[in-house]
Swiss-Prot record:
It comes from the Eukaryota. GO terms for molecular function: acyltransferase activity, transferring groups other than amino-acyl groups; tetraketide alpha-pyrone synthase activity. It comes from Oryza sativa subsp. japonica (Rice). Belongs to the thiolase-like superfamily. Chalcone/stilbene synthases family. Disruption phenotype: Small pollen grains with irregular shape. Reduced spikelet fertility and mature seed formation. The active site is at C170. This is Type III polyketide synthase 21. Pfam families: Chal_sti_synt_C, Chal_sti_synt_N. The gene is PKS21. The keyword RNA-binding does not apply.
Amino acid sequence: MADLGFGDARSGNGSRSQCSRGKAMLLALGKGLPEQVLPQEKVVETYLQDTICDDPATRAKLERLCKTTTVRTRYTVMSKELLDEHPELRTEGTPTLTPRLDICNAAVLELGATAARAALGEWGRPAADITHLVYISSSELRLPGGDLFLATRLGLHPNTVRTSLLFLGCSGGAAALRTAKDIAENNPGSRVLVVAAETTVLGFRPPSPDRPYDLVGAALFGDGASAAIIGAGPIAAEESPFLELQFSTQEFLPGTDKVIDGKITEEGINFKLGRDLPEKIENRIEGFCRTLMDRVGIKEFNDVFWAVHPGGPAILNRLEVCLELQPEKLKISRKALMNYGNVSSNTVFYVLEYLRDELKKGMIREEWGLILAFGPGITFEGMLVRGIN
């Protein structure tokens, strides 16, 4: 890992250089989770009861999906009490967008505030020192947006500069890191609070043969929030950075805009995921990663550490095979998927939390690493990062 100082960023593989002057760093993390814990072994019964479904074929398919996701635990806003209050949510063909948004807007604010307070507590400085807020969600829709309500709830100064990134799906967290990095490096002395908050309430509905992906969502996706604080020029006596954000890039794959497809309707959001998503990612991932690694002259994929948004096990498996990665390279991504499910924009931050733990324990020998996420577009988000002692 790099020492906390200033120097030339281009050190190559295997060396331990000082940190680059003016580069953004990850200073703190936090998360917020719903009270309802959903063990994977209870998903089938819970979902079928919640949706009043007794179809044997649906049960069999959901059981198969739950076994293949590798998820063990998720957290969810949805509850029996919520469904008792809003029985229309489990009635097929009912216009429910308004109550769904009412539930989602309140839930993401509460979860986001919890995550932000956790990050602020770890950071150790007052909320008034936050100069910018980057807010990410694919679960709310309102004016003014959740960024304003979150800033108010946290007691941020009225002149805090706010940026919202909405409906970016699974690439939203990495996009927020890229945005925060650019803000921090172009506004000396700034401290950027990043908050991502998601819930699956917007897409919850009874199973239907016309929407086979609904069962994938029931088996894979979870709810939660995460937060991070980004800044350049850390104060040695007050801040403890663990990751330097060196270089970021984004790329979309032309002609793939229907592979990850979501539409807001009167019944919520209808979401579809193409079976060829892992293949599409595999076809481009090597060149995309080399664009990042070439910045520091690294040629071998096993010579960096990896923090990949775990959209599902199929994508991680394809990456591991395609790039000939050692099994431990994607261990923290698989761990995040196992313990939280796919929480859309949040999940990459849960991966980074595990990365921080391994960096602190000296379990990672590589100096450089990659953060990756894939979202609608198909959009690739990538960042070259460096661990800090």
